[in-house]
Design a protein with these regions (language model features):
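Rossmann-fold NAD(P) dinucleotide-binding segment
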Residues: 1-59
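Helical "substrate-binding/catalytic lid" subdomain
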Residues: 108-230
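Rossmann-fold dinucleotide-binding core
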Residues: 39-121
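Residue-level detector of anion-binding/catalytic polar loops
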Residues: 4, 58, 100, 140, ...
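Amphipathic alpha-helical hairpins
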Residues: 3, 9, 13, 33, ...
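ATP-dependent carboxylate/acyl-activation modules
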Residues: 95, 234, 239-253
Length: 253
């Protein structure tokens, strides 16, 4: 195998991929290319990549962002870090996975992914608060959604994830367990670099509450369900809301 692509739950699992009993370091790594798509710790991954490169391999970090429907369509975005030599060796495979966004040296892809998810989780929590406030003040959720789009508060999360609240499934294609794992990694990065992160701390607490109330398998947007229930309102809206897992690949008939 010349190129290995990995995408697992988190730091412990990716460390096992490289250094476990049957890990890559147990075989010849010379001239092999390792592309990792996992959301993980930049510090840990830079250390693991050095071990792989010391064994003769090339490392690329390419954590993905988007959604399940992005993966189905084949247009996921990858935050790609690594040397130019490694990138050229990996380019054909990367181009088949999705779209690349170059972020510099190895490890920067993990940084980009974590701060991307930092904004995403804060925004998801804020959407729940705004929707509940709007509903209690007399503005219906579907009207709120339409007037927010195109304004200063517009975003991918607003367009993509609010329908999962309307539908009442809260998008189980990305579990709250995974969202909380990402927030734990973000908190580690915040502590490592000693930055202020009050909004991140608040979102972290909201997602912890959602996990405790609804369980690991609940959808990521149950953070909004939590705020709904605490506000004693219902944000569901009748409509033909297409779930992310129902999206078709462009070549499917």
């Amino acid at each position: 195998v010349d190129i290995v692509v990995s995408m697992v739950f988190g730091p412990k699992e990716i460390e096992d991929v490289l250094k476990g009993e049957n890990g890559m370091l147990q075989t010849s790594c010379k001239d092999k290319v390792w592309i990792d798509l996992t959301t993980s710790s930049p510090t840990l991954m830079r250390s693991l990549a050095k071990e792989f490169e010391d064994a003769g391999g090339y490392s690329i970090d390419a954590p993905v962002t988007g959604s399940l429907d992005s993966a189905i369509r084949g247009d996921m975005i990858m935050f790609v870090g690594g040397s130019e030599i490694a990138l050229e060796k990996a380019r054909e495979v990367l181009d088949r996975i999705g779209k690349t966004r170059r972020v510099g040296k190895y490890g920067n892809g993990y940084v980009a992914k974590l701060v991307n998810n930092q904004l995403w989780k804060i925004h998801a929590s804020a959407i729940g608060e705004a929707m509940v406030l709007a509903k209690k003040a007399g503005l219906e959720p579907d009207v709120w959604w339409e007037v927010m789009k195109g304004g200063a508060a517009d975003s991918f999360v607003l367009h993509h994830d609010v329908p999962s609240i309307f539908a009442g499934h809260y998008d189980p294609s990305f579990r709250v367990e995974l969202a909380l794992k990402d927030l734990d990694l973000i908190q580690e990065l915040v502590k490592e670099h000693n930055t202020r992160a009050e909004l991140t701390n608040s979102a972290h607490e909201r997602f912890k509450e959602a996990k405790e109330r609804y369980g690991d398998e609940a959808g990521e947007m149950t953070v909004c369900k939590l705020i709904e229930e605490d506000g004693n309102v219902n944000l569901q809206v009748d409509g033909d809301w297409i779930a992310p897992w129902e999206v078709k690949h462009p070549n499917d008939k």
